Amino acid sequence: MRIRPFTDSDLQTLIDLTIETFRPFYEHYVHPLLGDEVFQHQHGQWEQDYRDDVPTLHDPIAGRRVAVAEVGDAIAGYVAWRPSGKPNSGEVYILAVSSSHRRQDVGRQLCLHAIDQMRADGVRFVGIGTGDDAFHAAARALYESLGFTKIPIAGYLKKV
């Protein structure tokens, strides 16, 4: 596996990979949890949201960076990180690994790469967020194995 900087030619592959990675979360967890009406209101355009968001992830002038993991000639995953808005702080904003490359240390190596890059830029505190659902269990285990501390935060939504 090789980790390298993002190039513009990666963009469509990363968009597709992001949608592939998170489709089960939205279709099999969020949609049944929220029901049709609330899901459509909150996340009905989730694929388009990623199509709009992924192109903004890499902006070195703003301190936002992306690194890509390759296995052979295939993109196996990517990580995006950015400043968090607090002094000396950053965050891993998104980590996506293709289904065919999971459980092969790709996510771990991408996270370590992002942390190392942030440290080199003077960051002393790194945050990362994820869901507390079954879909994100592997991500939580990874982050905890990297020394991150889980902070109990709950979010609620109600139609009124």
Regions found by a protein language model. Give the residues of each.
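Conserved acetyl-CoA-binding loop-helix of GNAT-fold acetyltransferases
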Residues: 97, 103-116, 141, 145
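Conserved beta-strand-loop-alpha-helix junction that forms the acyl-donor binding cleft
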Residues: 102, 127-139, 157-160
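Acetyl-CoA-dependent GNAT
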Residues: 5-93, 98, 111-112, 117, ...
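Extreme N-terminal starter segment of soluble prokaryotic enzymes
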Residues: 1-3
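Conserved active-site alpha-helix within GNAT-family acetyltransferase domains
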Residues: 108, 124, 132-152
